[in-house]
Amino acid sequence: KYATKYPKVWKIKKLQLFILHVHAPCVRILTKMCYCYYAQIGGKYMDKKAKIITVAGKGGVGKTSISASIVRLLVERYPDKKILAIDADPAVGLSVALGVDVKLTLDDIRMGIVDSVENGETKEALELLSEARFRIFDALVEMPGFAFLAIGRPESSGCYCKVNSYLKEVIGLLANSFDYVVIDGEAGIEQIQRRVMEKVTHLLLVTDQSKKGAQVVSTIKNVADELIAYDRIGVIVNRVTYPELADLITVPGVEILSFIPADSAFAANDIKGKSVLELPADSAVLTGVKDALQKIEIL
């Protein structure tokens, strides 16, 4: 699967598979070789900067639907580009919205490492981390036009900072193998910064038409200013039921990119259990998200 669409990533994967079957004392040397090989075969491929689009907002405003719509529009506009969808919400709603069957999450991999350590297994830490790095490729679900990665539920009690930091670094390396990365986050931005990555190119904040929703988005923006680095930011107002009152929605210091009316086609699609990929092309959600992406120079 990877050999055709991700030939350079596949070479790395084969090298890591080789590492896993080597005696532990050799792992450090071979891992360093892997890093060198990573840089060598990457060249221009790894130097390019992926466009990383993070979607955040108050719960219940259609954030996941917006994220799924972004993935669909990117796939349709850029069929020759590599697109990665990351579900950073423990509810794993993005997988449902995109029709993805998730078998393995990043947290499953993390807990596997933690369990090995707590059970007293003799594998060295570096060997365990190398194995985790390999298994992330197993967690990738390949869909028509895009790949999908689920982060999973939040960490359990206890501190495994080195493991979490390592996995976040691997996500960053993986993201740079793609042209576009769409991250569907939790209601806040803190979990994305702690569990996924600290720098994105585009931050899209989603709210409904309520005053409370706008206040939550404003708070998320202020927190994001301190926690993560981003190049562009904008707000999408979703499920607008009173368009004549649209001017009352303001978020200080942030441009409102699009007002999306309540979409009966989307509601019917959701009731039938269909994914966003099956929405009519002229649906209000897709039209509104497309307008927002054009304003923020993604499309």
Predicted regions and their residues:
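P-loop/Walker-type NTP enzyme "switch/lid" segment
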Residues: P90-G172, I271
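Walker A/P-loop phosphate-binding motif and the immediately C-terminal alpha-helix
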Residues: K51-P90
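Short hydrophobic alpha-helical segments enriched in small aliphatic residues
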Residues: A3, V22-V27, A39
